[in-house]
């Protein structure tokens, strides 16, 4: 894996999303500097809120960008 890894959480509940994100963080090698979490927002903000709350302290920073359905977990600055 290298660069940016995209993780689509559509259709997952909070537990499944957490498991998927944790697995992506474990698999992220030295070449991965960002995990783009696609959680959506039209169906509600539960996944977005969980991602931002639970992973803010575990990564270098969160990048929320202009798309409210995406949160980037920045592992290291590029």
Report residues per predicted region:
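Long, charged, low-complexity intrinsically disordered regions
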Residues: 1-78
């Amino acid at each position: 894996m290298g660069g940016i890894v995209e993780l689509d959480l559509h259709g997952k509940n909070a537990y499944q999303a957490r498991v998927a994100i944790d697995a992506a963080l474990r698999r992220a090698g030295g070449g991965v500097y960002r995990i783009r979490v696609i959680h959506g927002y039209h169906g509600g903000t539960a996944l977005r809120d969980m991602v931002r709350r639970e992973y803010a302290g575990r990564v270098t920073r969160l990048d929320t960008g202009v798309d409210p359905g995406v949160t980037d977990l920045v592992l290291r600055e590029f």
